Amino acid sequence: MDLQSLLAARVAADKPVRVGLIGAGKFGSMFLAQVPSIAGLDVAVIADLDPDRAKAACRSVGWDTARVARTRFAERGRDACLDERVEVIVEATGDPAAGIANAIEAIEAKKHTVMVNVEADALAGAFLARKARAANVIYSMAYGDQPALIAEMVDWARAAGFSVAAAGKGTKYLPAYHTVTPNAVWEHYGLSADEAKRAGMNAQMFNSFLDGTKSAIEMAAVANACRLDVPHDGLGFPSCGADDLASVLCPRPLGGVLAADGMVEVVSSIRRDGKPVERDLRWGVYVVFKARNDHAAACFKQYGLPTDATGRYAAMYKPYHLIGLELSISVLNVALRGEPTGSCRAWRGDAVAVAKRALKAGEMLDGEGGYTVYAKLIPAERSLALGALPIGLAHRVKLLRNVAAGEFVTAADVALDDNLRAVRIRREMETQARQMTQVLTAEQGAASSVFLQHSDVTRG
């Protein structure tokens, strides 16, 4: 990896990597803070619903007057996508429908796309990645966010000749968190509502981190990028610290918690009694890998890696991730090396809506981190069989029937707007998946999982 030399060549040629940023929120602002320190990287356009807020964000992260003045500010993502100077689009709105629309606009304009918007990727990454490949541009996860870091670790393990047993991240989790609502979220962060307000923290967004929704979305993205499996009935969130990864995240017959090798999972930084886990990974990412031969297993021991009881499972981890401060790694990879930092390759997992409480017909769902639903990660084939409603479509939609607490919300339970592009794309994905499953089953006697793993329709 020699991005610095490749970028220096661009500087020498007076051909900087020019970026269009859509969404100047927290993630985008962290990226903007680093741009002045990276010679050869230039943000030519910033699109935000509030351009004045975007300008203020630039000033707040240290941009000087001259840099702000030479940057184009716009209200529409389309303006960034169509700007002829732009080579890479960074989609950082956080809105699934907007993210899908912006990514399509960028791809059709022959721009590489770095998708910070993991909500959009979990909803329609297979469609977007396939469309990008057809257009001969790159569709990439965003480095700095946990899914891309996990994908990098999985790739490292496989390229080194190991098999991957598990990959994922850490978080703070208790089962009761699934039903927490925004009006009670701050007590779990040790903050008062006033403190959170002064810090500009959004209650619903931070609640999505707590109630399991963000974990489900991110692990769906990881499973789909790395062709890993997901638990049948949602993430287990085992309590586990860095030193115990290999012994906890191995198959059940070996004393671990996994149904099998090759799974995504999220570990909790606290035990079920609320006590902290030693050397927790609340902010980190990990991969558990398996030696394929006795010699490699012996080397684990010789070099001091903590392993499971068999000595064949070991782990690597990063204790932290730097979010937007690391985003330039993705931008430079796609522009200078023509490579994504993780990209959807299959449709293996789906983050779907589950009722937080008894819901009544006529109520409006309020999406991730809200008062009505949280997301559970399940296999894509199970989601298709249930007709489950993806969490990315569970915002501002009306319930047509009652749904009991803890039950899946299905697409038939809500009034989806067929005029929305995101709805049409999702339905197209589902229809193609069902049709191809039927073909494979009829022709090969194959299980639907064969399609979900290998077909061009779902590889994205």
Go through the PLM ranges and name each one:
Residues D2-A8, H188, S192-E443:
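C-terminal catalytic/substrate-binding lobe primarily of soluble NAD(P)-dependent oxidoreductases
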Residues I100-E105, V118-V137, A142-D145:
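Rossmann-fold NAD(P)-binding glycine/threonine-rich loop
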Residues L49, G94, V118-D121, G144-D145, ...:
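Short, ordered loop/turn segments at secondary-structure junctions
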Residues V88, D95, A106-L123:
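ADP-ribose/adenylate-binding Rossmann-like module
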Residues Q444-R459:
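Intrinsic disorder/low-complexity segments
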Residues V45, I89-E91, T113-V116, Y139-A142:
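Short catalytic-loop micro-motif centered on adjacent basic/acidic residues
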Residues M1-E105:
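N-terminal glycine-/serine-/threonine-rich beta1-alpha1-beta2 phosphate-ribose binding loop
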Residues S140-L210:
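Rossmann-like NAD(P)H-binding beta-loop-alpha module
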